[in-house]
Curated annotation (Swiss-Prot):
One of its GO terms (cellular component) is chloroplast. This is Large ribosomal subunit protein bL33c. The lineage of its organism: Eukaryota, Rhodophyta, Bangiophyceae, Cyanidiales, Cyanidiaceae. The keyword RNA-binding does not apply. NCBIfam families: PRK00504.1, PRK00595.1, rpmG_bact.
């Protein structure tokens, strides 16, 4: 029997510096897709990931 899989959901992470950074390498907004466990992380996630548009590691926040 399969147990409930509702605890793990797919989320999108978006770079917060891409909107305000004027000196970017190229135009666009970096987005990553990942999975989070809703029971362990009930609040919105923030991860430091590489942004190819800013050409550096920036904070990526969870979007709806």
């Amino acid at each position: 029997m399969v147990k409930h899989k509702a605890a793990r959901i797919c989320i999108n992470l978006e770079c917060i510096d891409c909107k305000s950074n004027l000196h970017k390498r190229s135009n666009g907004i970096s987005r990553y897709t990942t999975i989070k466990n809703r029971k362990n992380n009930p609040s919105r996630m923030e991860l430091k990931k590489f942004c190819p548009y800013c050409n550096m590691r920036t904070i990526h926040k969870e979007i709806k």
